[in-house]
Regions:
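Walker A/P-loop
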Residues: 233-257
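PLD/PLD-like phosphodiesterase catalytic module centered on the HKD motif
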Residues: 1-218, 222, 337
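Conserved helicase ATPase core of P-loop NTP-dependent helicases/translocases
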Residues: 294-295, 299-300, 319, 457-458, ...
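Post-DEXD/H (motif II) to motif III coupling segment of the RecA-like Helicase ATP-binding lobe
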Residues: 338-397
Length: 971
């Protein structure tokens, strides 16, 4: 009955009045694809497939890409024994027989094909434990419909006895019975018909397309061309283009040469095969308008308009001298991240073109050479992998992170023996996974990245002995041998075609193999840059190429945390962000691409995130220098946010203030504060302007800028900015925090407020006005303090405002954000920071206004038995929770918690998975106690059988826990 009541309220919210409070998960909802909101049809299907007891799908179209998008989930539910039926239409012979074959391979799914030309239904019905979920709308089982296209689907929660369930099941069964069972004989016949229609479609497309038509710039290229025009109008003669692999950098350079009307052009790169392909690209743009030539050691032509060469050839002094320094109007340096080498420097310093363009996917270098300075910090345009996916400049990829083999119970690590890397078990697993995940057209053309040359050679030999055609390429192979191998990989001649190329790192960059449809990674991830470079080898668009398959064998590697950094483009190096990305998966990635991990590999990534020190001085300095090089000046905290770089609070955590960190790196920085003002800056940077809350920071900003403001005016400013009311409690809170009475340190071995230790006067309240205090007023007279103080405020407010866009704000806390105990009690307006050990799992505030509850979900084995409470979620809304030891139902704190709702005492819940996550807890929402589920029980030491009384109770969250975080915490 409870479900029906909740459903009724949810229907009222969805259909009658949006302001009616009800269960969000039961409300009618439009399911669509919206990357900005992190919404995908795929995510909803993923979730419901894993929640249901049985499912029924009917779709007009199914493609291999659509099934691959759901593949990991379909495997999971097969293992769980969740049965399903899928009815597919033969409408227009669009459904892919390869997709049907994959679906038929699942023992738990019954698949039928209906041959009625007017069957165009798209419906998904899920039977849950006590209800049904129905999705009807526009989405077929294709990768674009599930992740990218503008779709319109209605999701309804239904009771078992509802009329809609009866009708939906009846209609499904009627058509399912009309459908035919799919035999191998039928599939073979249908494959012939499917191929016929597919080939007709390809032929029609070719007829409609003039292969010699002049190419036109894509959306990204148009923006970059506009910027390049603008730079030249400002008389700027050099610029850097940062563009992800396969997004059309070379064509862009040709378009810009055309729009600049350059007569003589030089294109320099480090390999001849790239130079030759660049020449072909320019020829497609200019056709017969210009002449083209390769400047080689054997034939150094200089009569052509456009000359293509390598850095090694041209840097020869004799070769350089054949050109006047002003011979070229326009020079292009491809793979510009290499421009710090002596050969490139010699070329760049010799010539004086009217315009110099550098192009790279990865300007970040580890050798301290400043690529940005070389181009005077003029960035013409920047598009990284995630943006390229959004703009559909590359093919979608389906990434599968799978567990590598175990040897004697342990996963392979960086020090694995050669015998284990190339053993029979691993070879068989690589082959099995390659066949299982396959590729878009069932004709594998794979590039396999290994960790050692010997491994690549041996694996190639073992693949060949099993009937595959493969080759191993290393640095010892000539460029001609590499080109021949690439031609064989792309060949349509089955006698000469290669299935696999095994390599180590020679294909990390610059190699263009558009037909690659599978990438296998057999090496630990040592660099997110190299990971993206290797992934990029298969992302270039090509005729009829639908997607790229990526198979990553994940072992017990220290740097597994770099995998989410690379895949999701998150360079904040926030452990919390990385965990959320791994958990959220597909909804966090643009377009039709998907990211899948098996459970063991996912745990290995979590372990790596937990154990990694992401804030070493070396890493901090590296990211600081990267941004400094990019900007051409010392970056401030706000610059890190605006450039999507490392979260700058990490510099504060390491050095007490950002100024302290900068001073430790910049030897010539003459910006020293006196000890008093430095201490004040450190306190504000660390304890107040840390991005966790906003009210005290906003007031601090206003006070420091205006010196005095009336409460009435401040109330108005706060409401206009945040739609939050500012009352007397807020004034008390602000004064307590900003005057540093809350924060405690030790003086003379006693816990003492910072205000009493340092005698800082920050803000005064008099005559209904807030006025700046003398300590802050005097400090702001010092320019260095002024700059770094206001920067920390700008960072804090911006960080908070970025977070609040994507989650609920609940009386001071952002749902699903992480907080330390210190920040939690501050936000809850405790007058003095408590001794956190004394608070333990919960603590009632002195004014009985709140009682924060802390749960470490997975307890450490070495803690005392009296702290090993078995707190656990019974579902996404219900928490089974235990009091402290030596408590009964009559204990004061227990009574206060039981009667919290009656007495308006808030029970905010803070949870972390385990102690490896550090000192921060997720805020999950506020709790309400179920007075009908209170039990006195015991907690017992299993060793000595000693017991202590405790109280067990059920509590309900104000909002069901978000699915991905729920899974992360409980698994």
């Amino acid at each position: 009955m409870e479900f029906e009541n909740n459903l009724l309220e949810s229907i009222k919210t969805g259909l009658i009045n949006k302001n009616i409070q009800s269960e969000i998960s039961l409300q009618p909802k439009i399911i669509t694809n919206n990357y900005a909101k992190k919404e995908k049809v795929l995510s909803t299907l993923d979730f419901l497939l894993q929640e249901c007891d049985e499912f029924f799908f009917n779709v007009a179209f199914v493609t291999k890409s659509g099934v691959i998008s759901l593949f990991n989930t379909l495997e999971k539910i097969e293992q769980l024994g969740i049965k399903g039926k899928i009815l597919v239409s033969k409408y227009q012979n669009f459904s892919d027989p390869s997709a049907l074959r994959i679906l038929l391979g699942f023992s738990n799914i019954e698949v039928r094909l209906i041959d009625e030309n007017n069957f165009h239904a798209k419906g998904y019905l899920f039977k849950l434990k006590n209800s049904y979920e129905l999705i009807v709308g526009s989405s077929n089982l294709t990768q674009d419909a599930l992740s990218k296209n503008t779709e319109y689907n209605l999701k309804l929660s239904l009771s078992n006895n509802s009329k809609l369930v009866e009708e939906a099941l009846s209609i499904f069964e009627r058509y399912f019975l009309k459908g035919v069972n799919i035999s191998e004989e039928f599939l073979n016949e249908y494959q012939i018909l499917f191929n016929k229609y597919k080939n007709l479609e390809i032929e029609l497309n070719l007829k409609n397309k003039n292969l010699f038509e002049k190419l036109s710039p894509n959306a990204m290229q148009e923006k970059a061309l506009k910027n390049l025009r603008f730079l030249r109008d400002l008389k700027i003669d050099k610029a850097l283009l940062i563009s992800a692999t396969a997004t059309g950098k070379t064509y862009l350079s040709a378009f810009d040469v055309k729009q600049s009307n350059a007569k003589r052009v030089l294109f320099v790169v480090h390999r001849w095969n790239i130079a030759k392909k660049a020449m072909d690209s320019f020829r497609r743009i200019f056709q017969n308008e210009r002449t083209y030539g390769l400047f080689e050691s054997s034939s150094k032509e200089i009569k052509d308009d456009f000359i293509f060469t390598t850095n090694l050839t041209l840097s020869n002094t004799e070769n350089l001298k054949r050109f006047d320094p002003k011979f070229f109007d326009y020079i292009i340096i491809d793979e510009t991240h290499r421009a710090g080498s002596a050969t490139y420097q010699k070329i760049i310093n010799y010539f004086s073109p009217k315009f110099l363009l550098g192009m790279t996917a990865t300007p970040e270098r580890t050798d301290d050479y400043d690529i940005f300075k070389l181009f005077e910090h003029n960035i013409a345009y920047e598009i990284r992998l995630q943006k390229a996916m959004e703009e559909e400049l590359i093919v979608p990829f389906h990434y599968f992170g799978i567990t590598d083999i175990s040897v004697n119970g342990s996963l392979l690590d960086e020090n694995a023996d050669f015998q284990n890397l190339t053993g029979e078990e691993r070879v068989e697993k690589i082959i099995a996974k390659s066949m299982k995940y396959g590729c878009d057209d069932n004709n594998i053309r794979a590039l396999v990245f290994c960790s050692r040359k010997e491994e690549a050679i041996e694996l190639s030999n073992k693949f060949n002995s099993r009937g595959f055609k493969s080759i191993a390429l290393t640095g010892k192979h000539t460029e001609l041998e590499r080109e021949e191998a690439i031609q064989r990989l792309e060949s349509n001649n089955l006698d000469e075609k290669l299935d696999y190329i095994f390599t180590v790192d020679i294909f990390n960059e610059g190699i263009d193999i558009p037909k690659i449809n599978q990438i296998i990674m057999l090496r630990p991830t040592q660099s997110n840059i190299i990971f993206i470079q290797q992934l990029g080898r298969g992302l270039r668009k090509f005729e009829n190429k639908e997607y790229l398959t990526v198979i990553d064998f994940i072992g017990n590697y220290q740097n597994n945390f770099l995998i989410p950094v690379a895949l999701f483009g998150d360079t904040s190096y926030s452990k919390d962000n990385l965990r959320k990305l791994v958990v959220s998966g597909n909804s966090e990635i643009p377009g039709a691409s998907t990211i899948n991990f098996d459970e063991i590999s996912k745990q290995k990534i979590f372990d790596s995130i937990s154990s990694a020190n992401l804030q070493t001085k070396r890493n901090l300095i590296n990211d600081y220098k990267l941004l400094k090089n990019r900007l051409g000046r010392i970056p401030m905290m706000i610059d890190f946010l605006e450039n999507n770089s490392r979260d700058p609070i990490q510099f504060v955590n390491y050095s007490n203030s950002y100024l302290d960190f900068v001073s430790s790196v910049e030897n010539d920085l003459d910006k020293i504060l006196d000890s008093t003002n430095l201490k004040l800056l450190q306190i504000f940077s660390r304890d107040i302007n840390n991005g966790c809350s906003f009210l005290e920071v906003f007031v601090l900003k206003v006070i420091s800028e205006e010196k005095i403001i009336s409460i009435e005016k401040l109330e108005k400013r706060i409401f206009e900015k945040y739609q939050i009311k500012f009352d007397n409690n807020s004034i008390e809170f602000i004064l307590n925090i900003l005057n540093l009475n809350y924060f405690i340190d030790r003086k003379d071995k006693k816990r003492t407020p910072l205000r009493s230790i340092y005698n800082f006067e920050i803000v005064n309240f008099e005559n209904n006005n807030l006025r700046i205090g003398s300590s802050l007023k005097n400090a702001l007279q010092e320019k260095v303090f002024f700059n770094y103080f206001h920067d920390s405020i700008a960072y804090s407010l911006s960080a908070f405002e970025n977070k609040i866009k994507n989650t609920d704000f609940v009386d001071g806390f952002l749902r699903y954000e992480k907080y330390t105990r210190r920040d939690i009690h501050k936000i809850l307006n405790w007058p003095i920071e408590p001794i956190h050990q004394n608070v333990g799992g919960y603590g009632v505030s002195d004014d009985k206004e709140n009682c924060p509850i802390y749960v470490t979900y997975k307890k450490s084995e070495d803690i005392a038995y009296t702290s090993k409470y078995e707190d656990k979620f019974l579902n996404k809304k219900t928490l089974e929770w235990f009091s402290k030891q030596k408590r009964t139902l009559q204990s004061n704190d227990v009574q206060e918690i039981i009667n919290s709702k009656d007495n308006n005492m808030r029970l905010p819940l803070f949870v972390k998975k385990d102690d490896d996550e550090g000192k921060e807890f997720y805020y999950l929402g506020d709790l309400e106690v179920d007075k009908n589920c209170l039990v006195e029980t015991f907690i017992t030491d299993k060793k000595n059988k000693k017991s202590e009384k405790i109280v067990k109770m059920k509590m309900y969250l104000d909002k069901p826990l978000e699915e991905n975080l729920y899974k992360y915490l409980i698994n």
